[in-house]
Regions:
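Metal-dependent catalytic neighborhoods of phosphoester/phosphodiester hydrolases
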Residues: 16, 49-67, 83-102, 106-108
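Conserved catalytic scaffold of divalent metal-dependent phosphoesterases
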Residues: 97-98, 102-136
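A generic structural signal for short, solvent-exposed coil/turn residues
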Residues: 1-3, 71, 98, 111
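N-terminal active-site segment of His-dependent metallophosphoesterases
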Residues: 1-68, 75-76
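Proline-centered loop/turn at the N-terminus of a beta-strand
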Residues: 2, 78-80, 105
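Divalent metal-dependent hydrolysis catalytic cores, especially in the metallo-beta-lactamase
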Residues: 42, 80-83, 133-136
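Residue-level detector of flexible, active-site-proximal loop/helix-junction positions
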Residues: 10, 86, 113
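Cofactor- and metal-binding active-site motifs of prokaryotic enzymes
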Residues: 53, 73-74, 78, 82, ...
Length: 136
């Protein structure tokens, strides 16, 4: 299995009042080109997709435009979005049902199966079931 792992996009970020959307656009274009040439099975975006829990409409549009373009360029590509400390997990999960129809899976909040314990990550084709308690 081949995947691309990325994080800390911080879409919507400004630097000392300077709008960074052009930089973000160039990064996302580069990532789309990489997806087209490398043909990964999955793209994992591990947190801090946005720079703030309440991103601008422009930042959200940039994400959703990217997701649609990425899944159209690489048939069968699965995308996993994981919320970071700058993201609102519930806001990121809000369109999860719609995104799932495009092979985009969102995990914004932690769901525990028990009251603690060691968890192990599971492989396979069940992105809705990513961890289970490790047997004692």
């Amino acid at each position: 299995m081949k995947f691309i792992h990325t994080a800390d996009w911080h879409l919507g970020n400004t630097f000392h009042g300077h709008d960074r959307s052009e930089e973000h656009h160039h990064f996302l274009k580069h990532l789309l080109d990489l997806i087209s040439t490398r043909r990964p099975d999955a793209l994992i975006v591990a947190g801090d997709i946005f720079d703030t829990p309440n991103p601008s409409a422009r930042a959200e549009a940039m994400l959703y435009d990217f997701l649609l373009e990425a899944t159209s360029r690489a048939q069968g590509l699965q995308i996993v979005l994981i919320a970071g400390n700058h993201d609102s997990g519930s806001r990121l999960e809000a369109p999860a049902a719609l995104l799932k129809s495009h092979n985009v899976y969102v995990r914004g909040t932690v769901r525990r199966k028990d009251n603690g314990g060691v968890l192990r990550l599971l492989g396979g084709r069940r992105p809705d079931h990513g961890a289970e308690p490790l047997p004692e």
